[in-house]
Amino acid sequence: MPLIEQYDVVVVGAGHAGCEAAMAAARMGLRTALFTLNLDLIAQMSCNPAVGGIAKGHLVREVDALGGIMGELADAVGIQFRLLNTSRGPAVWSPRAQCDKQQYRVKMREVLESQPNLYIKQAEAVDVVVEDARVTGIRLRDGRTIRAGATVITTGTFLNGLIHCGEERIPAGRSGEPPSVLLGESLKQLGLRGCRLKTGTPPRLDGRTIDWARFEEQPGDADPTPFSFRTKTLPMRQISCHIAYTTPETLRLIRENVHRSPMYSGQIEAIGPRYCPSIEDKVVKFPDKDRHQFFLEPEGLNTHEVYVNGMSTSLPMEVQYEIVRSIPGLENAEMLRPGYAIEYDAIDPTELDRSLRVKKFEGLYLAGQINGTSGYEEAACQGIMAGINAALSVRDDAPFTLNRTEAYTGILIDDLISKGTNEPYRMFTSRAEFRLHLRIDNADRRLTPYGRRLGLIHDEAWADYEAKQARAVTLEKLLATRKIKDVTPLAPALAQAGITDAASLAGQTYAQLLKRPEMSIEALWTVIRAEVAEGEAASLFAPWFTNAEEASQPLPAFVRNELKSVETEIKYAGYLDQQRKSMEKLKKAETRVIPEWFDYASVSGLSREMQEKLVRVRPQTIGQASRIPGVTPAALSLINVYIEIQGKRLAKGGHPVQV
């Protein structure tokens, strides 16, 4: 008799999506099992040992604000922190951290193993169990059946994975690990539409064989910005990365051997990530460029392994050696691991609804690269959403979704389920219609109340959140109401900002002064400090002065971040109000639900092509339908009218379609 185990939620795959999914479900009180092919490689950073980056840092902040774990882990093992895009406006500032690859994996396992309700298992899932259009669990290669109220699949690049290095082809989920073939076939048998995608990774070098003096040093920020709102200190020693460039000899070697690249020989037919091209792709597509930049990034404090960011390649190993050694400073470099490309199966994300549930089956959720995305951060935000909704479904509660006005996470999911993707999807700030509202500094204000309601934010974190919001409200009110009586104390700040009309400031509020583009809130710190340190709200602001008794001491990072958030709300108030009006219009479209029974074929005036697209995606709202490529405003108006027509027929006891 086969062995059967029972859980509330089962998660397949312990990468960045799977870990977030399992933690979310367990923290919500559900008995959760997390299955992985190798317990020692949980949360493995298969590619770049870094978290965050432009737009990706926004996703990490959102995961953290909801109660996820990626941000805190990156802070705990980060060895270089940089805040990117600071030359532009605060809407697009984004944190990035180089991480200790080994410590990230170790720390993640510690966190998972210490979580009540969570059981981590090493085994291979080979089949999805389906009963009456409901997924009821999985089967393992060892014969066990794992029954669960909800199943989350987060297999990354493992579904029918195939590695390419030159002419060599190796079935693998990633280097050194077997692919998941049987589970891939099981998902195909469910009738889900799929595609074949490709990604790649660069060679790793031995840092002891690099002449570091030949490269430009790239240090981290002197005062690092953490990912997590809950992080108090950054414990790891900080180190530098280095900037390098290809040479004419590098380009010659690539051009002469490009026919041996699987991408150009026809060996790989899958589509790779547009915004993370291989080095051979760069050389072919940008023939006029005489050099390409790349970065030498240490993989940790206790290893000599160096990641060559910007040199992803699947050229033969001997060619990779020549390419590396064509660069001054790398003439004697030893390659620890070659770069490679990997093809894998993905599911068409238009098969999913907004909760990341597969529409055709109850109880089945997908997250991460299986949905056509690229990147740890894109995976993590899907993982926490899938885990939350898997838990809610077991409780028979309504799903939790985020829309495009609330979070980059909502934008990512909406893009996937509305438009699908034929290449690995990467998040950018340009994908957001309202990015001034979706900043890194206000991710907690946007999402932490949701996390608290769901049971993902513990009491101490919630108390810190409430205190922070109270400080922001108090400070905004103070700056908006307190008028400048004497400009003398402001003289240094005004001089630094280049403001010469000091006399005209008398009678203005500090908020009016702060609206000037050249004025920063930190320049007003002396005035603010005097107001909040001894005023009625002194106890509320006490955390600001714990480590800064003297006014001359540098501001702690969290104080600076809170001040900057208040400054942004004041300085961009007019633009924020304009965006709120546009957001309300979008929200109205999102509340207009398209019923599941709606028949597009009966809508007179819809072209066959448009009908096919709408039937394929099955949008849940008019707003989602509007974002399907090719669906026109006229078509949306028709759908709106026919929802009423078909609804009235149904209400009279008939069929929604006139027959």
Curated annotation (Swiss-Prot):
Coiled-coil boundaries: none
Annotated InterPro entries: FAD/NAD-bd_sf, GIDA_C_N, MnmG, MnmG-rel, MnmG-rel_CS, MnmG_C, MnmG_C_subdom, MnmG_C_subdom_sf
Cofactor or coenzyme needed: FAD
Subcellular location: Cytoplasm
GO molecular function: flavin adenine dinucleotide binding
Gene name of the encoded protein: mnmG
Name of this chain's protein: tRNA uridine 5-carboxymethylaminomethyl modification enzyme MnmG
NCBIfam families: mnmG_gidA
Segments traversing the membrane: none
